[in-house]
């Protein structure tokens, strides 16, 4: 049903242009992001449970359709996700993390990061897991360590704990200097530029 809703909004001409822009063979429907966001908001309202959203997001991601993957990320992009029982928002975090090895381009990587960053801020102890990504051989997983942690670069008045987290992330950035991959360098400059705007 969710895929049917996305397909009704398909725009083949827009899809062709988007495929060329993103340089991808992945199926694209040509649905603008604001329309995807509106659909995701509606689905979230229909079933606000973590289990329901995680199940739908997982199914959408597995279609491999570009807009379906954007919608999957949008379903899990909110500051507060109240989970049932002791697991809390862990299923949402685990799902987003499971997407990392399947990422193959910056656009979907950034949508996944929007969802993941909120879960990371909700539970900063997950930085332990994120640190492991800095040693990954997979470009988009390694890049995710910087992009998921951007909220710490945006803080205007960081607490002592957040300053420690910021220093930790900056140490990862320092370790990326030797990596000549363009997307890695761009993620570092993005982080530093964001930080300098608030903490020159």
Where are these regions (language model features)?
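Alpha-helical scaffold domains
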Residues: 1-200
């Amino acid at each position: 049903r969710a895929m049917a809703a996305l397909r009704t909004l398909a725009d083949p001409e827009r899809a062709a242009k988007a495929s060329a822009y993103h340089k991808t063979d992945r199926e694209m429907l040509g649905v603008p992001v604001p329309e995807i966001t509106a659909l995701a908001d509606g689905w979230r309202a229909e079933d606000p449970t973590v289990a329901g959203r995680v199940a739908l997001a997982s199914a959408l991601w597995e279609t491999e359709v570009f807009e379906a993957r954007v919608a999957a990320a949008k379903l899990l992009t909110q500051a507060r996700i109240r989970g049932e029982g002791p697991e809390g928002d862990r299923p949402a975090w685990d799902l987003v993390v499971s997407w990392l090895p399947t990422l193959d381009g910056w656009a979907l990587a950034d949508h996944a990061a929007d969802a993941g960053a909120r879960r990371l801020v909700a539970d900063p102890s997950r930085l332990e897991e994120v640190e492991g990504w800095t040693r990954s051989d997979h470009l988009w997983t390694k890049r995710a360590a910087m992009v998921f942690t951007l909220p710490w670069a945006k803080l205007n008045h960081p607490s002592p704990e957040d300053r420690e987290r910021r220093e930790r992330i900056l140490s990862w950035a320092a370790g990326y200097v030797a990596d000549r991959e363009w997307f890695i360098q761009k993620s570092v400059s993005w982080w530093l530029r964001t930080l300098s705007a608030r903490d020159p």
